[in-house]
């Protein structure tokens, strides 16, 4: 099970522009590096499903919810 600290570390690793959030582009780049490419529409849909504050990106709390559900 992932805890808040681990989720924050993952966010920091994925957050290339250091905004404190993961954009669809950052998530797509990560998925591509682990040989798990998704279409942009799929990634955007995933983020939209888990984006509680409606900003189009995933923050630490939202990422934690995804990883622990």
Swiss-Prot record:
InterPro entries: EF-hand-dom_pair, EF_Hand_1_Ca_BS, EF_hand_dom
Residues that coordinate or bind Ca(2+) 1: 15, 17, 19, 21, 26
Chain residues that bind Ca(2+) 2: 51, 53, 55, 57, 62
Domain EF-hand as annotated: residue spans: 2-37, 38-69
A GO term, aspect molecular function: calcium ion binding
Cited Gene3D superfamilies: EF-hand
PROSITE patterns: EF_HAND_1 (PS00018), EF_HAND_2 (PS50222)
Domain of life of the source: Eukaryota
CDD domains linked to this entry: EFh
Record key words, sorted: Calcium, Metal-binding, Repeat
Protein name (Swiss-Prot/TrEMBL): Calcium-binding protein
Organism expressing this protein natively: Schistosoma mansoni (Blood fluke)
Source lineage: Eukaryota, Metazoa, Spiralia, Lophotrochozoa, Platyhelminthes
């Amino acid at each position: 099970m992932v805890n808040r600290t681990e989720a924050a570390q993952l966010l920091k690793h994925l957050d290339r522009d250091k905004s404190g959030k993961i954009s669809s582009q950052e998530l797509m780049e990560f998925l591509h590096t682990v040989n798990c490419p998704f279409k942009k529409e799929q990634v955007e849909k995933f983020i939209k499903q888990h984006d509680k504050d409606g900003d189009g990106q995933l923050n630490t709390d939202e990422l934690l919810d995804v990883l622990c559900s």
